[in-house]
Amino acid sequence: MGARRIDGQAVNGERRRLAEVIPLDTPYAIAMFPIYACNFKCSYCIHSIDVKQRPHVVDKVVMDMGLYKKIIDDLQAFRIPSTEETIHNSPPPEVLKALHFAGLGEPLMHPDIVEMVRYAKEQRAARVLDIVTNGALLTENLIDGLVAAGLDRIRISLQGLDANMYR
């Protein structure tokens, strides 16, 4: 797969001040928590506490694809219009600006993360799809798969001053 520039530039290169668009007609962004597990044990995080001593947010550690697809399908009210729809519906409806794969766990641990990104992109669930990750599980194949699936941005979270503190 060829390289593609991925940066933090705003959609269409334009930024609008939040004060100009409030109140919003739709949610600005949705945070999706695909997994409740992590490959790190950062001192500030609930995953550093022994499993027996911490309450689970959910009974299932991994979000199943059926539930995920239902959530994405339910977001259709905020879907990005196609070019044809934009021509016939003027002005285009407000859309969800961003879908973030993040949360109480490491999203790249989900076995179907590439398919999750692909499904969200196919459904035009948001203008921007991104993942917040600690980066430890990134491989060339995974990066290629995520980019091919339509991921717009990967954000690496560094939460420490040195390697020992980070791990």
Give the positions of each predicted feature.
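Conserved phosphate-donor/acceptor-positioning beta-strand/loop module used by diverse small-molecule
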Residues: 156-158
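Conserved alpha-helical substructure of the radical SAM core
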Residues: 2-153, 164-165
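Conserved nucleotide-binding/hydrolysis micro-motifs of P-loop NTPases
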Residues: 161
